[in-house]
Amino acid sequence: IYANELVLDRRTKGLAPGTIAVLEDGERKPVGLVGVTPASKIAGRMLERDTEIEIGRDWLVAKLTRALELRERLFATPYYRLVHAEADGLPGVIIDRFGDTCVVQPNAAWAEALLPELTEALAEVTGVVNILKNAGSRGRQLEGLDDADAVLLGAAPEAPLPVEMNGATYMADLTGGQKTGLFYDQRPNHAFAARLAQGQRVLDVFSHVGGFALAALA
């Protein structure tokens, strides 16, 4: 919810980033619960329509459980984007899974404020033993958040991890690579490009881990 679509009084503007608040319409009727970042152009992120629900560990467990059930229907192995922000009911949050390791990008202030609860819920739902925080997103800067990466649970891998996608094996650098280490969101595009590339010569420019090139070769 953009700031120019809201009436923000002095008290609202003084809320700490990440505060959970009730959003009301022009008639002061509750619309839902939002994570507030008063100084950002995205001043509120809708979390829940039911204003009686507590946004905490149990709520996060429910959201993550639903996301996991969907991924397990779609993927045979635990290498995928587990949470894709608003699409999974967790606005501003990206979670990529690499076997027993997850990389979390809490790109919204509300998620940063609930990071301990999110870490516990993620470990409980998925059973992963390593959880890393990637704070390199530009979105965090817009939320007024720091850029400090961290190990939230377990340990960081000492070397890039092999990930099989579209018939090719990619090496995902979870601590030194771009974003979370691999562009899971490009998986369908890699597969589409591979079909177009059959029997052709392909140039993959600015390829990072070789997403399109390796898919074309496979």
List where the protein language model places each region.
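Conserved hydrophobic/aromatic pocket- or pore-lining residues that grip, position, or stack substrates
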Residues: D100, Y170, N189, F206
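Carbohydrate-binding surface patches
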Residues: T101-P106
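Conserved SAM/SAH cofactor-binding pocket of Class I
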Residues: H190-A218
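Non-catalytic accessory regions of SAM-dependent methyltransferases
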Residues: I1-G99
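A glycine-rich, Thr/Ser-enriched phosphate-binding loop motif common to dinucleotide/cofactor-binding enzymes
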Residues: Y184-P188
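Non-catalytic substrate-recognition/targeting regions of SAM-dependent transferases
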Residues: V83-D96, E112-L182
